[in-house]
UniProtKB/Swiss-Prot annotation:
Cofactors (names): Mg(2+)
Organism: Isodon rubescens (Rabdosia rubescens)
Biological role: Involved in the biosynthesis of ent-kaurene diterpenoids natural products such as oridonin, miltiradiene, eriocalyxin B and nezukol, known to exhibit antitumor, anti-inflammatory and antibacterial activities. Catalyzes the conversion of (+)-copalyl diphosphate ((+)-CPP) to miltiradiene.
Protein name: Miltiradiene synthase KSL1, chloroplastic
UniProt transit peptide range: 1-51
Lineage per the UniProt record: Eukaryota, Viridiplantae, Streptophyta, Embryophyta, Tracheophyta
Note: Abietane diterpenoids (e.g. miltiradiene, abietatriene and ferruginol) accumulate specifically in the periderm of roots. The ent-kaurene diterpenoid oridonin, main constituent of Isodon rubescens, accumulates in leaves.
Cofactor note: Binds 3 Mg(2+) ions per subunit.
EC number: 4.2.3.131
Length: 626
């Protein structure tokens, strides 16, 4: 098997993307500059040594003359490490077919209990995690020998090995899985103790352990990539049999490529923020005097979901709906009167613009026309993507969520007593996950039929992810909503036990978190299951949104009062990764050799110097170096 890049051309518009001094002053963020990026358009094939090394490491020894089940891969540990590294550095999308082939081979070896996998703890744990996440049927019982700490010789393993066991334990999809439950308990305890006693001398490894322990299921994809790039260290895999060969692959060239890929995505996210801000202003949402302005927050969250430049429309549709849902939710809560809130629902049901005087108030006009124009625009775009009209679906989703807002408004204003089930029956919709996902999914490159969108699977995916986000949100907003007499799941849990054994707030919060965890595992079961109605590409969106909920509400309300998010926003959207001169030279230094291969007119901008050259047919990516 050979590994080859298959990258798309990402045209560079030449627009300058500048920092926002008002939000992130230059003196506080030295990496941010008001100068435009120095554009580097180069062929990734210029780093020929790197390509050769990657191909060599992925070139499994497959004997095609023998039955498939006897396929032997002598380099399975290295292959798995490469896959893990590609994923952690955010460039795995370029190698997906090769990764799939290697995991197929790994699964065959797993079924045969081959020594390549089972003789090494790190390889064993990594194989389990990668295979389970991909949907292969692998039993956690195979990790039973490591489930109890007393059965593991800690003198013979190191912290990276325990990290791999810890990550494997996080893939528990059922409450009954005692093996992974016990594995999680001792590995998390061990790693926490290592941090407390400063027993990890390697600073990068210490920070990586701390990052995993803080909020593992709240690690957003692109934030995880940024952290991995900052803490990248090939020594993480030094215990493996193939460590020497692997370390030769993971050199500065490879890291430079991953950093450039990150900076390309970051430039795209900045462009999307500008588009989002123009849309916000065009909709006059910036003139509203109430509620939360979450434009930057929505841009950050959608950027953290995916860095693929091709998915710009997905991110923008999602971000716009985060903004719209938040603005209208705030209007229903405290920005407008009951009659004005009802009016918005009536207007959406009618779906017709009216003269300004018929809206009743300027706020109602602004909110309705923002929804009306945005949905109509997205419906036209989605018609092209899907090959059919989806406007009725989009309107239906808006009627649904506004109807839930109305139910909640009536309930709390009339002081109606609710059970927890009654509350959750509407609040899982009003959290907004369903409408944001199903509308943005129209631009994912997958044809979505009515059968798919109306299926029980779709409902279950939406409900489980929404329940996670709703319950975790309730835990963090419980005190505020109790003062406002609006109530949430925590207050309802407290009320439900008044006539039984009374529970305190801490116990009620624990119950709410347990229910959120139950729904998270249910979501994982559907996402990891193969042969379902939705392709994995679609189901992954639900998992990404679940991580957003875990990120936002793990220790506070980061959505309403962002604190950690502000630091993360700087590193993801504003601060480019440094491409050190030696690394840059490794990637773009062979421009002369490249220019000799030219076949089509092209302009190569290298460190602000322009060379009019031709473009070889295999140049598929634009790299920006700051």
């Amino acid at each position: 098997m050979s590994l080859a890049f298959n990258l798309r051309v990402i045209p560079f518009s030449g627009h300058t993307i500048q920092s926002r001094r008002g939000l992130f002053p230059v003196h506080e963020s030295p990496m941010i500059t008001t100068k435009p990026f120095a554009a580097v358009k180069c062929s990734l094939t210029t780093s020929t040594d790197l390509m050769g090394k990657i191909k060599e490491k992925f070139n499994g020894k497959v004997h095609t003359s023998l039955p498939a089940i006897t396929t032997h891969s002598a380099d399975t540990p290295s292959n798995l490490c490469i896959i893990d590294t590609l994923q952690r550095l955010g460039v795995d999308r370029y190698f997906q077919s090769e990764i799939d082939s290697i995991l197929d081979d790994t699964y065959r070896l797993w079924q045969l209990k081959k020594e390549d996998i089972f003789s090494d703890i790190t390889t064993h744990a990594m194989a389990f995690r990668l295979l389970r996440v991909k949907g292969y049927q692998v039993s956690s019982e195979e990790l039973a020998p490591y489930a109890d700490q007393e059965h593991v010789n800690l003198q013979e393993i190191d912290v990276p090995t325990v990290i791999e066991l810890y990550r494997a334990a996080q893939e528990r999809v059922t409450e009954e899985d005692s093996t992974l439950k016990k594995l999680y308990v001792w590995t998390s305890t061990f790693l926490k103790q290592q941090l407390l006693t400063d027993a990890i001398p390697d600073k990068k490894l210490h920070e990586q352990v701390d990052y995993y322990l803080k909020n593992y299921h709240g690690i957003l994809d692109r934030m995880g990539v940024r952290r991995s790039l900052d803490l990248y260290d090939v020594g993480h895999y030094k215990t493996l049999k193939a460590a020497d060969g692997f370390s030769n692959l993971c050199n500065e060239d490879f890291l430079a490529f991953a950093r450039q890929d990150f900076n390309i995505s970051q430039a795209q996210h900045q462009k999307e923020l500008q588009q989002l801000q123009r849309w916000y202003s065009d909709c006059r949402l910036d003139t509203l005097k109430f509620g939360r302005d979450v434009v930057r927050v929505s841009n950050f969250l959608t950027s953290a979901m995916s860095g693929d430049p091709e998915l710009s429309d997905v991110r923008l549709a999602f971000a716009k709906h985060i903004v719209l849902v938040t603005r209208i939710d705030d209007f229903f809560d405290h920005g407008g009167s009951k009659e004005e809130s009802y009016k918005i629902l009536e207007l959406v049901k009618e779906w017709k613009e009216k003269p300004a005087g018929e809206y009743g108030s300027e706020e109602v006009e602004i909110l309705f026309t923002a929804v009306y124009n945005t949905v109509n625009e997205l419906a036209e775009m989605a018609h092209i993507e899907q090959g059919r009209s989806v406007k009725d679906l989009l309107i239906k989703l808006w009627v649904e969520i506004l109807s839930m807002f109305k139910i909640e408004l009536d309930t709390w204003s009339d002081d109606t007593a609710l059970t927890l089930d009654e509350y959750l029956s509407s609040s899982w919709v009003s959290i907004g996950c369903r409408i944001c996902i199903l509308i943005s999914m129209q631009f994912l490159g997958v044809k979505l039929t009515d059968e798919m969108l109306l299926s029980e699977e779709c409902t279950d995916l939406c409900r489980h992810v929404s329940m996670v986000d709703r319950l975790l949100n309730d835990v963090q907003t419980f005190e505020k909503e109790r003062k406002e007499n609006t109530g949430n799941s925590v207050s309802l849990l407290l009320a439900a036990h008044k006539d039984e054994r009374a529970i305190n707030e801490e116990e009620a919060i624990t119950k709410a978190k347990d229910l959120a965890e139950y729904n998270r595992r249910k979501l994982m079961q559907i996402v990891y299951k193969t042969g379902t109605i939705f392709p994995r590409k679609c189901k992954d969106m639900f998992l990404k949104v679940c991580r957003i909920g875990c990120y936002l509400y793990s220790s506070g309300d980061e959505f309403t009062t962002p604190q950690q998010m502000m630091e993360d926003m700087k590193s993801l959207v504003y601060e480019p990764l440094t491409i050190h001169p030696p690394e840059a030279n490794n990637v773009v230094g062979k421009k002369t050799e490249l220019c000799q291969q030219l076949v089509k007119p092209y302009v190569c901008h290298t460190f602000c110097k322009k060379y009019t050259v031709s473009r070889p047919s295999n140049v598929m990516m634009t790299c920006y170096i700051d």
